[in-house]
Design a protein with these regions (language model features):
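Hydrophobic anchor at the beta1->P-loop junction of P-loop NTPases
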Residues: 6-8
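P-loop (Walker A) phosphate-binding loop of NTP-binding proteins
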Residues: 11
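ATP-binding Walker
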Residues: 14
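N-terminal phosphate/diphosphate-binding loop that engages ATP/GTP or pyrophosphate donors
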Residues: 26-95
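Small-molecule kinase domains that catalyze NTP-dependent phosphoryl transfer to phosphate-bearing small molecules
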Residues: 65, 75-76, 121-127, 135-140, ...
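NTP-dependent small-molecule kinase module
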Residues: 85-95, 101, 160-169, 188-234
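ATP-dependent NMP and nucleoside kinases share a basic, alpha-helical "lid"
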Residues: 92-168
Length: 234
């Protein structure tokens, strides 16, 4: 069967990665969490002091650091999930902290960083058969993706979902801190100059505020056949 690229973009904490992962499993495609690359770079820049706690970045040092930075994903059979490795270390847990979430949008605004990540993503998608979730996959990284989905959902519902995910590892997280982080990230992601978050004209809109994962998958299965035939040029 023809292999395609499925691009899933949308606002923070709309459940893009759970949805994308489930699609990848069902289709036996590779799932790529593109936000993890921006988060890993943010961690590296913070660790080296190139990114300060008030989000200032030494651009020259950043360019040099990028040349020394190697990021890859490795599938962990035990938990059946792919994990992020930064210069050989498993950083999957560290990159999910609220600290990194608070800083990552400032790093993702920088054109050189976006070019670095785009190159990795285009290599990973060369053979197609991938599901990628992010902010600019359908608009900038793979504008020729056969199937594009843009996800949104109610801000409060997103914040509650995100808090539930964070609490086991960060018991001091509050609904207020999560809400303000989501609003701030949405604002920066949507207003940056390079590849801002927006719905591609040919993307399907999925508002999952009141949908379970099974309902989202039902919707997905209903639209998928339209994008798998050979003469599809959506
Ligand atoms: O999906 P996420 O929350 O892990 O993404 C983290 C940040 O990375 C998000 O605030 C914006 C940025 N990002 C981006 O600019 N472009 C992408 N394709 C993916 C993520």
């Amino acid at each position: 069967m023809k292999k395609i690229i499925i691009a899933i973009d949308g606002y923070s904490s709309t459940g893009k990665s759970s949805f994308a992962r489930r699609i990848a499993t069902e289709m036996e495609y590779i799932y790529i969490d593109t936000g993890a690359l921006y988060r890993a770079i943010t961690l590296q820049l913070a660790k080296t002091g190139i990114l300060t706690s008030d989000n200032r970045i030494d651009r020259d040092a950043m360019k040099q650091e990028l040349q020394r930075t190697e990021i890859h994903f490795q599938f962990n059979e035990a938990i059946q999930k792919s994990e992020t490795f930064l210069n050989g270390d498993n950083v999957e847990e560290q990159i999910r902290s609220l600290q990194i979430a608070n800083q990552v949008s400032y790093v993702a605004e920088i054109p050189e960083i976006r070019a670095y990540v785009d190159q990795i993503l285009r290599d990973l998608g060369r053979e197609r058969g991938v599901v990628m979730d992010g902010r600019d996959i359908g608009t900038a990284v793979f504008p020729d993706a056969e199937l594009k989905i843009f996800m949104t959902s109610d801000l409060h519902i997103r914040a509650e979902r995100r808090l539930k995910d964070l609490l086991p590892n960060q018991p001091d997280a509050t609904l207020e801190s999560v809400l303000s982080n989501l609003q701030e990230r949405d604002r920066i992601d949507s207003s940056r100059e390079t590849h801002p978050l927006m719905q591609a004209p040919d993307a399907l809109l999925l508002d999952n505020s009141h949908l379970t994962m099974d309902q989202q998958m039902e919707w997905f299965q209903s639209i998928l056949p339209n994008y798998l035939n050979d003469d599809c040029n959506h």
